[in-house]
Amino acid sequence: MFVIGVDPGAAGAIAILEAGGKLVHVFDMPSVEVISGGKAKRRVSPEMLAAELRLYADQGAVAYVEQVGAMPGQGVSSMFAFGQAFGIVLGVMAGLAIPTQTVTPAKWKKDMKLNGGKDAARAKAAQVWPAHAGEFKRVKDDGKAEAGLIALWGVGVT
């Protein structure tokens, strides 16, 4: 059985663990570039996401998706895009028949004793999976770190 952790959003990530907590695969959220209002934007690709997860779904998987609310200072269109990405993730999980639960950042971070921001998540992920520390070394790898830790939280729940 596999446990999937998801940090949603076009800049998010997916992590897949074995039931014992071993990191199997971690990757940036599959996305495509679209033109919106004359600007290039990244959007989650449901087709690419489904292709990445199908193998794990076929072998038995559960998923834990971070449920994030509105953030101060974030515009209406940004929140709409984030909500759309969240919905795409849930839809892909449902389409692949992967049982899915949402978890708030406050809940999983408290349970994982994670204090601090994105850097703390990267440091903890590198500590938990030292053989994969390179996956979490860049500042922009915070999504991978959080996805991994969400999945690890899910291992404790499953």
Map each language-model feature to its residues.
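Phosphate- and other anionic-substrate recognition elements at nucleic-acid/protein interfaces
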Residues: 1-158
